[in-house]
Amino acid sequence: QALEKVAHYSPLNQGLSLFEHWLDVVNTVQGARDAVVGPTPKEVIWRKNKARLYRYERTTPATRKTPVLCIMPLINRAYILDLRPGASFVAYLLSQGHDVYLLDWGEWNDEDRSLNLDVLIEQYMARAVRMVARRAGGPLTLLGYCIGGAVATCFSALHTEGLIKNLVLLTTPIDFADAGPFGVWTRPEVFPLELLTSVFPAVPGAYPDIGSKLLQPLPAGIGQFVRLEEKLREPRFDVYGWQAMFRWVNEGVAFPAGCYRQWIGEFYQRNKLVRGELQISGRKVLLSNIRCPLLNVVASSDVIAPRPTTSAILGHVSSEDKAEIIVKGGHVGIVVGKAAATDLWPKVGEWLRLRD
């Protein structure tokens, strides 16, 4: 028996066991490329260039009269709100009786270098909003995530003709005076914005993603694979959920140079939005013009859009009905993490129900 124990704990056996565990890690990571995402059926009801306006299919008639239009970040795949079964904010909103629409900006490339926020807001988004409102026969709820939230905010400030009934912002940076490490790294004296946008007609998705990962270099780098190796030993570990999330994180979308120049230069570097100096198509974007009910969602441990950046919106709008909820988690985790279905989704759902 003693010899058997020695053989069992021999360096060779331990080495083989470690090799097998890390082989599982490699196979899991490689399999992420084929992870099934975006499971909720949907139809394209409008398109322009690369952008698509989707309406998610319902199996029963809507019981809420106010539809929800989701506005996504320009640099991420839109399926994050419909990641997989059990991790789909879209599916939750459908279950609550809403008609749900989503504006997917698509995959930009070099031919889109001149696209800027003026065009995206006043041509793409304006048409999408009017189409949803026309189909619904009334105003809608705008739900914006991250950069998509900033775009939705600008639109709401510019268009006060009654199209927007409610505005919901998820981890949306608004005031960049204290934007955390990312704000420091994008200061004009250290960040080569003009060089970057002149070299790249569409800034590769990997570049903004590198900035995000550098905010937490160990957890976002080798640390994620060390944690994966540990989790793969757990019988109840959701491998398919991990693969879907890993796929999304690593499928960045190129950022048109015109948009990127505005986003970094006018928002991060010069903080024009809260100063009332931002102009879209020759019109000033004044946050004080926003009077609709506003729900601002902040992630407690968000390093991409820290709380000073996101909470500021409440002090600039004229909405009498405005609220903020702080959800435990990070920039992405609050939307699709384990606690999303029991924390964020019900809170947003109840807020919308009371304003339907």
Task: Name these PLM-found stretches.
Residues Q1-Q14, R134, G138, A152-G258:
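Alpha/beta-hydrolase-fold enzymes
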Residues G31, V36-N109:
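Short, surface-exposed "cap/lid" segments of acyl-processing enzymes
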Residues S114-R134:
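Alpha/beta-hydrolase active-site loop
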Residues L143-A152:
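Gly/Ala-rich beta-loop-alpha elbow adjacent to hydrolase catalytic centers
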Residues N271, S300-A305:
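Acidic catalytic loop of the alpha/beta-hydrolase fold
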Residues I290, N296-V298, D302:
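Short beta-strand/loop motif that positions the catalytic acidic residue
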Residues C292, P306-H316:
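Short alpha-helix in the alpha/beta-hydrolase fold that links the catalytic acid
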Residues E324, K328-D343:
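Catalytic histidine-centered segment of alpha/beta-hydrolase-like enzymes
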